């Protein structure tokens, strides 16, 4: 199973063999522990539930659910798989499941930007600031026509921006260190520092 949970540490650079600086995102990934294995026969689908981190003040439901795996997780995630996985409750996986050159998908929650206007949120164009401009530089403008007399659902307007789940696909693994559980992927990964990242590899 090539899926890990990790914590985003930030970005840095690695020097390639040709001397070019390669931007990479460092992630403290794993180890993760299997807390439940689901199969088509018992649950109707194939999946693996994995735990990551050390949690505090767990609810009785979570504590009882993870007791057999002997973990007190901070994060618990379920990963669907096509075929049944040969893993047992209590098994652990670390960054050694990945190698330099592998391709992974990174899923995280993007940084929240708060309430944002249409120019920042939807890349609207600002109005003229001179040449007869009326001072309504950053306003939305018309939000509909005379008929039908309504605003269509999904109309791009101001509102809360960010804090949404984002997946960046096909990132190349540039660095792996099993001793410190560090993995570096080329490019940017969604979310703030210390944010949870789900790394999914191509099996």
What is the predicted function of each stretch?
Residues 1-203:
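Extended basic (Lys/Arg/His-rich) segments that typically form rRNA-contacting surfaces
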């Amino acid at each position: 199973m090539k899926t890990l949970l990790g914590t985003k540490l930030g970005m840095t650079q690695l020097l390639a063999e040709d001397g070019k600086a390669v931007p990479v995102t460092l992630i403290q990934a794993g180890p993760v522990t299997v807390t439940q294995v689901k199969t088509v026969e018992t649950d109707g689908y194939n999946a693996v539930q994995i735990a990551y981190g050390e949690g505090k003040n767990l609810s009785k439901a979570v504590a009882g659910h993870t007791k057999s795996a002997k973990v007190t997780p901070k994060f618990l995630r379920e990963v669907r798989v096509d075929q049944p996985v040969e893993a047992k409750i209590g098994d652990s996986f670390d960054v050694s499941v990945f190698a330099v050159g592998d391709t992974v998908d990174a899923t995280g929650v993007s940084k929240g930007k708060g309430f944002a206007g249409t120019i920042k949120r939807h890349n609207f164009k600002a109005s003229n600031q001179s040449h007869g401009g009326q001072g309504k530089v950053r306003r939305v403008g018309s939000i509909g026509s005379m008929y039908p007399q309504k605003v269509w659902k999904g109309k791009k307007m101001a509102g809360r921006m960010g804090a949404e789940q984002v997946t960046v696909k096909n990132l190349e693994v540039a660095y792996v260190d099993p001793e410190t559980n560090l993995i570096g992927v080329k490019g940017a990964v969604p979310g703030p520092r210390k944010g949870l990242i789900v790394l999914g590899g191509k099996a």
